């Protein structure tokens, strides 16, 4: 099959719509269930490239959670700690494979933004991954294959309409790509730039100690950013993107946005959050929304009398500003990556507030010296 008709394009008024191969060859993908749309396929194909490259670069199973053509999260398949199982609503005693851990961690970076996501897996989707996805609100999944059991589980989602796409893992796209804007065709070579440890040798700070875990996290950050709408900044810890600031017109706004998301991710570890007692049969999205509001300055929106009873079995005490500040200061070992240079040292200052100890960015600003001087104040390595 060399083309696939779509219901509509980016918007419902944009018809007709289709995906096809310019050279007339067969599409490198097969729809196993559902009827994916235009944005679904954009998410799927971008997410697949991300997880494929992440697997190649780290040697670990990788997963991504995509929304609106940018990753809400990405991660490699490190085992989940007990606190993470609790945070991410993993069923007690669930036996998790590495690829299941990768997706749970990818989705767990920003569960609010991952609502209705497109999942991408570097490896065959197994039953453990499918069982976790079964209870999450998701639009679809792309993977190089599915076990029979996993496919049957996924086909039960969305009343049988869950989108399941299988990609040919051996497919190599043409070296040139095209895009039309206002009737004008743009042509460019594909972004085949390889991200690996060889890029991490130019340490501009006095501290030259770059642990292997930090190198891995830098690679996770850079590959995640490669498939994020620019401008973008990504915070990573333990092989997991914990905050992605995508598509902002100011670099510092990217850094702040990603930092705020990283802070929220870390605050979800707080005993008060882990101890929240929800009403029976509450849906996962409602829990996620309640936690997000509980952690915000508008916490009274879920704690006010007559309101909290809809969500909580017991009214929780607020997490005070001082408690949040104290908890966030305990976050360490975070890596911050940027898809372009930091123009000012304020990005470094903001990143430090969210536990960043390692920064990776390409450099090239006329104020590089100022950015490096700011890094030197904190002595952590900063490769370029």
Predicted regions and their residues:
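Active-site-proximal loop/turn and secondary-structure-junction residues that shape catalytic pockets
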Residues: 70, 125, 237-240, 342
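Glycine- and Gly-Pro-enriched alpha-helical subdomains that act as flexible
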Residues: 74-110, 243-330, 335
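Flexible, glycine/charged-enriched surface loops at secondary-structure junctions
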Residues: 57-65, 164-167, 230-237, 267-278, ...
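Conserved small/polar residues in nucleotide/adenosyl-binding loops
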Residues: 378-384
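Conserved structured catalytic cores and adjacent interaction surfaces
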Residues: 233, 242-257, 261, 328-377
